[in-house]
C-alpha cells in the first residue's frame, strides 16, 4: 500500500498539519524525510521495520554502507538519514557551548554524541576558562593512547592558543571497560607535570564508555 492509498487523516503530512509534529511517531517523521518506499512496502512500513530492528540510537551510529543493507534504503536515503542525525549532533554541540564543568559527570554528558567513531579510540582536549566553562574542544589523536605517541606539546599548544586557564583530557575505550590502563596513567602523569610547568592545570582525565565513565580526579589519581 502506498502512502497515497491511506486515508488522508492517516497520512503523515496531513497528521503533521492537523495535529503538529509531536503527534507523529518516529517512523512517520522519518517517512516525511525519506518520502518514497518500494513496490512492496510504503515508506512508513520501511521506517517502522528499520526502527524496530535498530532503534534511533543504533540507527544513528550505522555507516552509509550499513544503512544501505536495509531493505528500501539506497545511497540517497542513507545520506538523508546520516544528514538528519548529523544536524541533531550539531544542534546538541551548539547548545553546550560555554557549558560549565562541575564534575566528571558533566564531562560525560558533554561528550555524548561527539565521538565520530565509537569503535576507535579518540583523545579529546577540553579547554576551559577561569569559570570552568568550555571554550573549545579538539580531537588531539585517534588510535591507542600511548605516552610515547602523545606529546604534551600538541595538547598544550591548543590550550595556549585558546588562552585556556585549565584543561580536561577525555578519551574513550571502545571495549566499554573504562578502567584506567597503565598507559592511561602514564599519559596523565606526563600531562599533569607539563601543565604544572606551564601553569595550565590538568583538572581531570576522563575515560568514557557508552554508559559510564572513569575520572582520574574522582579516583585521586592526579597526584
Swiss-Prot record:
Keyword rRNA processing: no
A GO molecular-function descriptor: metallopeptidase activity
Motif (JAMM motif): 171-184
GO biological process annotation, one example: proteolysis
Name of the protein in its database record: UPF0758 protein Paes_0735
PROSITE patterns, alphabetized: MPN, UPF0758
Family to which this protein belongs: Belongs to the UPF0758 family.
The keyword Protease is annotated on this UniProt entry: yes
Binding site for Zn(2+): 171, 173, 184
SUPFAM superfamilies xref list: RuvA domain 2-like
Keyword terms: Hydrolase, Metal-binding, Metalloprotease, Protease, Zinc
Domain MPN span(s) in chain numbering: 100-222
